[in-house]
Amino acid sequence: MILAGSVPATILQKTQYVGIGIWILLVRGPAKQTCTYTSGEPMPQFMPFRGLRYTPAAGPLDDLLAPPYDVITPAMQRALGSRNPRNAVHLELAEGGDERYERVAAFLRDWRAQGLVEQDPVPMLYVYEQEFVEEGHLHRRRGIIAAVEALPWESGAVKPHEFTMSGPKEDRLKLLQATGVQLSPVFCVARDRAGQLREFTARVIGDQAPTGTATSFEGDHHRFWAVEAGSYEMRQLAPLLAESFYIADGHHRYETAVNYRNWRSQQGNLPPTHPTRFVMAAIVPADDPGLVIRPIHRLVPRAAPANWLERLGDAFDVERAKLPGDATERRAALQALLATSDAVALELAPRQVHALRRKPGASLAGKVPTGHSEAWLAIGPNVLRYGVLEPLWGISDEDLRAGVIEYSHDLDEVFAFLEARPGEATAFLLNPVRIDDVMRLADLGERMPQKSTYFHPKLGTGLVFYPLEP
């Protein structure tokens, strides 16, 4: 990893936001100086940037934050927009036709003129922590927000794990061309040898009290500190981020940044450290205890074929069970079955549960694409798709593109789906894909099907924006 701007760091300010708790480490230093650490991995450039941030005049930051655009429902959009007229949802997901892009650009110009957002006077790094509860357990996840060179996938410096669709990229590119500002960070994961990156962030933050606290719309807690970091600490960071990054969430945003860079380059050569060459990214250690991947279950609005269990016999061992009536017992029973299964098929009429376990070395009946490794075929979404959904339920690629299958990571939503269609639907529960599998397949150049991973919680939009013009 090449670290640009790694010289003397001083605290910019201790900005007090009433009721805010986003953990942001502001590391001050000139952006044009570069130090290099050599490793065997392809290395993108990595540098601080002059972030554009809300000022206290805009209101409490907990009324300004929003999730990324692609997880905001219409109801959530209305609720967020009503909290504050400057909520980031008005930028990320403006309503209307193509005129909405220019309207967002006008918002940003007006907010700057009114002192509601200000750009940091010098390049910064931002350290960001989220605290949340998952399955009854408290988690904390910490990452560094920085500018990472936006290189094509072929470079190997930043690696994808799933495919993208053209529609969202076209939308994001129009927004970027109109505003010249990246609104939300790409979520990246990096290998953290011996926990050095986590140790680094803990050390530079130290025991300082947070500048403030905030609770997001989803109920997650955020904290931030303005912390001074010296050049010694900055030089330490370079070798800790000396390997490829892996996209956890934000593939469309990353590809949009590459497309914008190419579009902007047609207007003239860009200097090596021009902001347009980079994408704002939050980098989280792969072994961070707070790195949570939720499963994404498949909801099929079709009744199970009459002979599906017999037809599964060649490739799967099947364990049948009765679904408990009590909600707590039901959840516990399903989790226990999933722990030793590739998938669990669930019907509410007659409340049957079938745990499916692929037999070692068994071939799947579906039309498995050629050229893939056994590691790719072994992940739950692929076992289900090519071993069950395609050959037995008749779910084709066209059906998937048409949205025949619904998806959810919430068991309550799964049960509601089935209860609304008694005897006419089936749900398939999956285990979460492990981060080791995500990185292993990315290293092999193999991408997972869409809706394979759900990294939780989503990064907040509105902590810091990334202007692309110096």
Predicted feature locations:
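Cationic, amphipathic, low-complexity segments that mediate targeting or membrane/lipid association
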Residues: 6-9
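Detector for the Zn2+-coordinating histidines of canonical Cys2His2
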Residues: 13
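Surface-exposed, charge/polar-rich loops and edge strands
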Residues: 39-470
